[in-house]
């Protein structure tokens, strides 16, 4: 079985950062990516469990997968739909 998170083209380490920094860093990173590229976000701020999915929906990106069952949390985002 392939780990979906290992397929990311880009990675963002947001460990130790607190709201709103993780989402601000995600936005800055995604701006530099091409449509269809993927980003693995690793974070430990509990607010990201709400903020990352909301960011994806608001900005029209796709949240391919997330694992918030334990820290660090992992999110796999695809730029665009």
Curated annotation (Swiss-Prot):
InterPro entries for this protein? Sulphur_carrier_TusA (IPR022931), TusA-like (IPR001455), TusA-like_sf (IPR036868)
Identify the SUPFAM superfamilies for this entry: SirA-like
Where does this polypeptide localize? Cytoplasm
Q: Name one GO biological process term.
A: tRNA wobble position uridine thiolation
What's one GO-annotated cellular component?
Answer: cytoplasm
Any one Gene Ontology molecular-function term assigned to this protein's record: sulfur carrier activity
Q: What would be one Pfam family of this protein?
A: TusA
Q: Would I find Cytoplasm among this entry's keywords?
A: yes
Q: In this entry, which stretches build a coiled coil? A: none
Family to which the UniProt record says this protein belongs: Belongs to the sulfur carrier protein TusA family.
Function of the protein? Sulfur carrier protein which probably makes part of a sulfur-relay system.
Name assigned to this protein = Sulfur carrier protein TusA
Q: Which organism is it from?
A: Shewanella denitrificans (strain OS217 / ATCC BAA-1090 / DSM 15013)
Q: What is the lineage of its organism?
A: Bacteria, Pseudomonadati, Pseudomonadota, Gammaproteobacteria, Alteromonadales
